[in-house]
């Protein structure tokens, strides 16, 4: 379904879409807009599957924001951290604003001003968060694609490589565990959730080769 249709409070997407439909559309369109040499769609779907059961989370109780669970430090690194604002990345942020202003029908949208980060607390300044946009799947998909653009690694292809990439690149809390049993359990959960929610992509992912998707 085209994103030109009216949005339901700009939270999930066109009014006739489910949350999962909106998430799939958001991922596909964001990857198309910030296209690399290979698709990042399967990997982004794995991240969303592992983080929120592919958008089946409760925004009010989730620890971070949106279907990809963008936390304060990650948001700061993507949009505000002075040391990461290369000229190339600044251009990406400008393109992200151009894209999302049209998609959200908000000429004042600024992806770098959705929250104010406090480096001392490693959290957002109280009352600085724009929850409507931080929870929006289109915004989350763009932030996720931008985060991948910042990385030097290749976009992982194939389920096993994607699970390893999720652990290394997205670095969920469990990735810091020293317990091999916990690590194996969480890796299996990430894989199983991706297969459960993205059957077609799980088959395609096994057949894809590893190529770079960071040539912007």
Task: For the regions a language model picked out, list residue spans one by one.
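N-terminal secretory targeting signals
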Residues: 1-8, 14-21, 201-216
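Catalytic glycan-binding domains that act on GlcNAc-containing polysaccharides
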Residues: 5-184
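Long, amphipathic alpha-helical surface segments
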Residues: 163-216
């Amino acid at each position: 379904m085209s994103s030109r249709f009216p949005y339901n409070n700009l939270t999930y997407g066109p009014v006739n879409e489910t949350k999962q439909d909106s998430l799939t559309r958001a991922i596909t369109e964001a990857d198309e807009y910030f296209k690399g040499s290979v698709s990042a769609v399967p990997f982004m779907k794995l991240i969303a599957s592992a983080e929120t059961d592919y958008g089946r989370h409760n925004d009010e109780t989730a620890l971070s924001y949106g279907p990809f669970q963008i936390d304060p430090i990650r948001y700061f690194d993507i949009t505000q951290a002075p040391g990461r604002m290369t000229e190339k990345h600044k251009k990406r942020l400008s393109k992200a604003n151009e894209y999302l202003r049209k998609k959200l029908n908000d000429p004042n949208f600024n992806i770098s001003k959705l929250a104010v980060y406090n480096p001392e607390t490693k959290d957002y300044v109280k009352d600085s968060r724009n929850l409507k946009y931080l929870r929006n799947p289109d915004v989350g998909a763009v932030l996720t694609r931008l985060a991948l653009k910042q990385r030097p690694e290749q976009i992982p292809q194939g389920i096993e490589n994607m699970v390893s990439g999720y652990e290394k690149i997205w670095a969920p809390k469990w990735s810091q565990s020293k317990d091999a049993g916990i690590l194996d359990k969480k890796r299996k959960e990430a894989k199983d959730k991706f297969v459960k929610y993205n059957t077609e992509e799980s088959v395609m992912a096994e057949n894809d080769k590893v190529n770079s998707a960071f040539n912007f």
